[in-house]
Structures are given as C-alpha cells and as structure tokens.
A protein has these predicted regions:
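Conserved small/polar residues in nucleotide/adenosyl-binding loops
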Residues: 251-257
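Conserved structural motif at the start of ABC-family nucleotide-binding domains
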Residues: 5-7, 20
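Walker B catalytic motif
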Residues: 172-173, 180
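The feature captures the beta-strand-to-loop junction immediately N-terminal to the Walker
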Residues: 36-38
Length: 257
C-alpha cells in the first residue's frame, strides 16, 4: 500500500529567526527525492522540523503522513508512524550496544506481542551487516562511540535497513565520505528502493546522485523550494552553481511534485 509524505506551507523558526518560509513538497513511497541548495537555505532545518527537534518552532503549515499531521505527534510517535532520520552528526550513546539499540527500536515500532525474537533479529542483522561490508564486532560496540565518520554513516544506513521505515530523511549522508564509503552507503539506499519506501536526500553534491538516481530534484533557496525537476537539474547546479536560482524566486510553484 502506497504512502504519502506531504509538506504544506511549512514555516519554521529558531530563536525567533524564520528559516523556512513556506516549504511545499510531496513525496510518495516508491520515490527518492533530492534536496539541494547553498548553505543556510534551510535544508537541515527541514529535516529537523519534520522529525520534531525541540530547538525548531513550527509557526505555520503541516506535515502530513498519509493525511495525519505528524507535527502533533511526539518524536517517538513519528518514528513509529514510519519516519526515519539519518543524521548528519549521529550522537554517541555510551553503555548501549549497537545491536541492543536497533532491536529496541524495531520492537518500539511493533505492537505488543509482535516483537522480533532474538534469532530473527540476529539473522537479519548479520545479513544487512554483510551487505554493507560492516565488521560483525560493530554490533557489540557502544552506539557510535569511537566510530569513524564513515562508520557512523554506514551505521545510519544499517539502522535504516533494519527498521524499514516508510520514509527516510537522509541529511547529508554523503558528507565526509571517501569514495569507497560513499559507494557502500549508496548501495544500501538503493537496496531499500521500492514501492514501500520513499526518501528525501539532502545533499550539496552531485557525486551522491551519481550512485543514487533521484526521481525528483528540488532546489531550496531563501527558505523555500524554488525549483523542481529531474536529475538534470542537479547536473546544471554542478555546472553553473546557484546564482541563476535567484531568478526562480519570482516563479516559485506553490506545490512542486
């Protein structure tokens, strides 16, 4: 069954400064959308607001998941509803192993009595770790503690594959990765691709899109989505930069799809 994530006229402020000034965007399962734009245009603010970061105040608009306004839900309820955020800077949690964290997260999404048993969990974890070329000992390390930048990003994708959300928001998942790590991360995202999964990928660089072909590319500027198109739009940005995007501010569509 297909699902829809719809962002409608979203305005977001932090410390009384408005960052998002009316974002409109619709993503369906079966689609991967890329969001690009210069620094300071609100890309990461968008991901944080969708997931309910307490530092960001939504002053106007809605974020609808299958018609339900998730802005009225707590962070854990948003995750249970089917949202996942791969963070740019994942937190370290001392005393909680990677495996325990993921099993708890899986069971938190499930109804009582439907929890994943230990053998099912280990079988799936081993399979996904092998697919992502992750050392098995990482499962017993404390979450992100002492992980390299590349290990943290691979671990975010491992969590994505274990949790199988409806929608993932991938906030600069490619930042700081060498080419080998980028290929592994991209392989994991492409493996998730299908009719039951949708994603918003926030990135600065065309290089990620060389490995993950998006269905749509959106350009953010001045706190809004000002241009939408196909993969060719990202290539134009790489060749010409963002200066030409300023002209699009006069022609912003109210609901790019």
């Amino acid at each position: 069954m297909s699902s829809t994530l719809e962002i409608k006229d979203l305005h977001v402020s932090i410390e009384d400064k408005e960052i998002l000034k009316g974002v409109n965007l619709t993503v369906n399962t079966g689609e991967i959308h890329a969001i690009m734009g210069p620094n300071g245009t609100g890309k990461s603010t968008l991901s944080s607001a969708i997931m309910g970061h307490p530092s960001y105040e939504v002053t106007q608009g809605e974020v609808l998941l299958d018609g339900v306004n998730i802005l009225e839900l707590e962070v854990d309820e948003r995750a249970k509803a089917g949202l996942f955020l791969a963070m740019q800077y994942p937190s370290e949690i001392t005393g909680v192993t990677n495996a325990d964290f993921m099993r708890s997260a899986i069971n938190a999404k499930r109804e009582e009595g439907q929890e994943i048993n230990l053998m099912q969990f280990i079988k799936k974890l081993d399979k996904e770790m092998d697919f992502l070329d992750i050392d098995q000992d990482m499962a017993q390390r404390y979450l992100n503690e002492g992980f390299s930048g590349g290990e943290k990003k691979r671990n975010e994708i491992l969590q994505l594959m274990m949790l199988e959300p409806k929608f993932a928001i991938l906030d600069e998942i490619d930042s700081g990765l060498d080419i080998d790590a980028l290929k592994v991360v991209s392989k994991g995202i492409n493996q998730m691709r299908g009719e039951d999964f949708g994603a918003l990928m926030i990135t600065h660089y065309q290089r990620l899109l060389n490995y993950i072909t998006p269905d749509k590319v959106h350009v953010m500027y001045g706190g809004k989505v000002v241009k939408s198109g196909g993969p060719e739009l990202a290539k134009r940005l790489e060749e010409e930069g963002y200066e030409w995007v300023k002209d699009c501010l006069l022609y912003t569509s109210p609901s790019p799809r």
